[in-house]
Regions:
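Vicinal oxygen chelate
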Residues: 2, 29-32, 76, 82-132
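Eukaryotic phosphotyrosine signaling hubs
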Residues: 3-5, 69-74
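Core segments of cupin and vicinal oxygen chelate
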Residues: 7-51
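Flexible, glycine-rich phosphate/dinucleotide-binding loops
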Residues: 35-37, 62-63, 126-129
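Exposed loop/turn and edge beta-strand positions of beta-sandwich/beta-sheet ligand-binding modules
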Residues: 38, 70, 106
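Short, charged/polar surface micro-motifs in flexible loops or helix N-caps
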Residues: 47-51, 62-63, 81-82
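Short, charged/polar, Gly/Pro-enriched secondary-structure boundary elements
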Residues: 49-52, 117-119
Length: 132
């Protein structure tokens, strides 16, 4: 067994793809329209087809979702957290907790929201691989 992907529903697929590729460096691996079901799936990731993906689901007749109160956040390692937060503001994301040390620690983190208001934690990984 292994983890394959996580899926989030988005209201504007192009805006979401731009956010995750230009800010967080994911690559669009494949995008498929399903006209009979009136939805599009886009799979983004850092590696090849054997690595986990972020699946963006765009339902053609829905542009806004109620995220509820159960969703926590996704976390991404970034080389320069300050530059990432600047880019997020440019791409209509929202920095909700500016970069700084985490409580009771020294790791520099920030919390942002993507164009659909999904919460994303950024963890600065200077001098290291941005991943774990």
């Amino acid at each position: 067994m292994r983890f394959l992907h996580t899926m989030i529903r988005v209201g504007d697929l192009d805006k979401s793809i731009k956010f995750y590729t230009e800010v967080l460096g994911l690559k669009l691996h494949r995008q498929t329209d399903y006209p009979d079901g009136k939805f599009t799936l886009a799979f983004l990731g850092y590696g090849g087809d054997t690595e986990p993906f972020l699946e963006l689901t765009y339902n053609w007749d829905t542009d806004k979702y109620d995220l509820g109160n159960a969703y926590g956040h996704m976390a991404f390692g970034v080389e320069d957290i300050y530059a990432a937060c600047e880019k997020i503001n440019e791409l209509e994301g929202k920095v909700v907790r500016p970069p700084g040390p985490m409580k009771h620690g020294t790791t520099v983190i920030a919390f942002v929201e993507d164009p659909d208001s999904y919460r994303v934690e950024l963890i600065e990984r200077k001098g290291k691989s941005a991943g774990y």
